[in-house]
Amino acid sequence: MTRLVYFVILAIAAFPAAAQDYGREKRLEAEIVPALVVGEPLKLRTAAGREFLAIHAQAKPARGAVVLVHGRNVHPDHEVIGALRMRLVDRGYTTLSIQMPVLGADAQRVEDYYPALFPEAVERIAVAAQWLSSRGARPLALLSHSMGSWMANEYFDAHPSSPYAAWVCLGLTGGFSWATYGSSRPILDVSGSADLPAVVDGAWRRRFALGFAPEGSRQVIVEDANHMFAGRDGELAKVVADWLDAVLR
């Protein structure tokens, strides 16, 4: 168990759990879908019948496909995720950016998210892989950012033999879970030199874990980039696409 998760669990014991806000997901969808320039909106469905938004952009020809997972309380076209889902198509990767579970706008604490939203987050990541695989898209990679990277880590803990052949992990606070040390897929860990303190301070722990990951795993620190890689998305997209080209051959 990582130190962050340990403190999160302690915090959960002290505060009431927050509720997932499906209404807010609908409002976010109504806000972003009319403004989409690249990609087609579609609905995916969980086993419980709950629909959630995804934005699909097909590369022609496609070298592979990437599922993108955004951070806390935002949407699948938000800032760095929105930029990457479009830029990766230009590099030959079909993208599927999915809406992750959100809380109400007044939820500010990290501990509100874990474990309340993680089970459905894990399922949505699995559903996205199934949808792409059913349409013949392969190989698959998962790209996550910020809180989405914790959700992705939780997904891989629950699905060690998942269909994702690679993981691009952006802006993860702290270190990877212990299960990641036995990862069967290469990992690209990317952060900014001006990232959040918890991301910067945890870089050595993530770098140590990558020593136990498969060949091709590496850590990249983008100089002068902040947590959202503002103004650096072009450089970030090149780092990601070049790495995918190498490990998904």
State where each predicted segment sits.
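Alpha/beta-hydrolase active-site loop
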Residues: V80, R109-R135
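Primarily recognizes the serine-hydrolase "nucleophile elbow" in alpha/beta-hydrolase
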Residues: Q130-R185
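Short beta-to-alpha linker loops that shape the active-site pocket of alpha/beta-hydrolase fold enzymes
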Residues: R72, Q99-D106, A225
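N-terminal signal peptide c-region/cleavage motif recognized by signal peptidases
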Residues: A14-A17
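The feature captures the conserved acid-bearing segment of alpha/beta-hydrolase catalytic domains
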Residues: S161, A165-F229
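N-terminal cap/lid segment of alpha/beta-hydrolase-fold proteins
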Residues: Q20-A59
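C-terminal catalytic histidine-bearing segment of alpha/beta-hydrolase fold enzymes
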Residues: G216-R249
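Short, surface-exposed "cap/lid" segments of acyl-processing enzymes
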Residues: E51, Q58-S97
